[in-house]
Amino acid sequence: IWNQVVNNQGKLTTRIYFDEMQNQFLTDNQAQFFTNLYARVRKYGAIPTGITQNVETLLARTEGRKLLSNSEFIVLLKQKKTDIAALKETISLTDALIRYIEKPKAKGTGLIIAGQTVVPFENPIPKDTELFRLVATDAYQSIE
């Protein structure tokens, strides 16, 4: 990863996606290594993106809380109550905003946090479209 970031610096923007990011915060050593890598690639012009369904695990460590609170752009979809409780300690969310991630009306509903601005969104994708087929991630969803 590091070699690619350095080779692309000043020529291309390197985007790095860390899926299941919470797995990088299971031990102190993992958390320390990952947060250093995350900061380092940002410094050299890459755009790291963390993806997790278990934000509570991420926020259980100081490094995870710092990483999230230092993020300028966050998208939150449906969250469990325990994850919401952990998020409320790190991000200022009103009860009116929490309803978009606690009990959303439909998939595709959530919050976009950009700096100090929080915008709720509802953007369900109709199931009978090519876009839905391309982005559907539910293993139990029948895709024709």
Region spans (language model):
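Conserved P-loop NTPase motor module
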Residues: 1-11, 101-144
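Conserved P-loop NTPase motor cores
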Residues: 1-100, 127
